[in-house]
Structures are given as C-alpha cells and as structure tokens.
Amino acid sequence: MIKSIINEKNIYNADVVLVSAGYDKTASSHKGTKDGPKKVVQHLHNQVEFWSRKYKKNTNDFVKTAHKDLGNLNKLNPEAVLKKIRTTCDQLIEKNKFIFILGGEHSVSIGHFQALVGKYKPKDVTIVQIDAHCDLRKDDSDYSDNPTNLAHSTVMRHASSLGYPIVQV
C-alpha cells in the first residue's frame, strides 16, 4: 500500500519537487502561514488518493515526487528569502523539474516567478490567483513599521511587472 505522495528522496531523480518555503514575516494579520508547508507535507504522507481513473493505476507508479525543505526562512530578510527560493527554483528548472511551492505567505511566489522568466517567456505563462485580495500594492507601508516592496500584498504586482498575464479570481 502506498503511504505517501513523496516517493523519491533525491530531488534530481524526481519528476515533481515540492519546495517547502515556510515564511510569514510580511504577513499583515495573523502569523502562522510559515507552518503551512509542514502541515501539508504531513498530510501528503497519508491523506492523498493516488488512484487515477484515466490511467487505471496509482499515480505514484509513474510520477516520482520529492520534497525539499528550505528551512526557517523567517530568520532572513525578504530579499534573502526570495534569493534562496529563486536559486532553488533555477536549479530545479535547469533540470526540467515541475515545481510546487508550498508557502508560507504569498511573497514566496515572487522568487519562483523570477526563476521562470529565465526559462519561459512570461507572455506564454498565465498566473491564476485565487484570493480574496488582489495583492497589487506597491509596498506594505500602510500596515508595517518596516515596509518592503517584497511583502505578501505585492506579489501580483511583481508577477505583472515581470510580464506575466494574470487572472484573478
């Protein structure tokens, strides 16, 4: 019986890499999203249905999935967080891996968006955002004593400025 969707230890042998980016330093309200990746991964070990009706077999039979945890990102400043995420994504994209970023707050996506620009034309990639907020702010100066233009509330502004078409739901 398959117990986990994470079925490959070596990220370079995997088809899909789940990248845990637990970070919530620029969250505007309650903190705790930094713990999201850990909780998601815990449930992926025993709460996922693997059977594919289309292929009539378990997806784990033909998709290798690995996990990379970037550690405690809250100890870093926003620029260092995005650099770490971008560097990780650059390395994985170079090896043609499909990347899932498990955040943390929305700003962790910026590093991934930046890495994708190196491989794909932004106009050929559409970013679909499902959120109650547009996240198009210039910075977080209206709710932070230490404002940054890399806050979670700026993520879609960054996507748009990189040239990505965005669809907001």
Language-model segments: residues:
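Conserved alpha-helical scaffold segments that buttress catalytic/binding sites
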Residues: M1-V169
